[in-house]
């Protein structure tokens, strides 16, 4: 089986021109390629890479470029299936262009499961589950109207410092999107909503590129369903 090749960090720039042609949300992949966070980049050929598989440490991945059947049938297939120790943790994979979807469906065959629209859980015996990612459009005017109704002055906020960076618990937290606290303080920003001196919810920039950013948000379990997510993201 042909191998996938792990690209060295000092060669990540070779993955950027093809990424600029990707029209779906790709800031997480760009963060890896531009060395904002330590991830991995697999390619079809080290000397002249055309196909790229970028893995963000949070577990998001993007397959893009000139994807030939040979690359799909390389170690990439075993990687997707979690075989031979090539992938040890779960990933959320997106592909571009969209016609790759049919090729991957055929590649994985009976190993591919789907999320049932009736709410039934997917078949646990399937190593790969096909799902959908929904992206929302930000409408500044609607946001401004909603923000006025939140009365932010009634709440206690604190900008995320180095100590908080390390101690905020949960799944979507700054330490899973940035290499370190100092890096986050220099290039990102985030706030926590405090209740009785305790962190109830946090919102932060998970990726920042040019004039774009993506927000990450986490609420502590005991403070959920109280509207704190809307409040902290508005801050």
What do these predicted regions represent?
Residues 12, 55-59, 207-208:
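A short, sequence-level motif marking secondary-structure junctions
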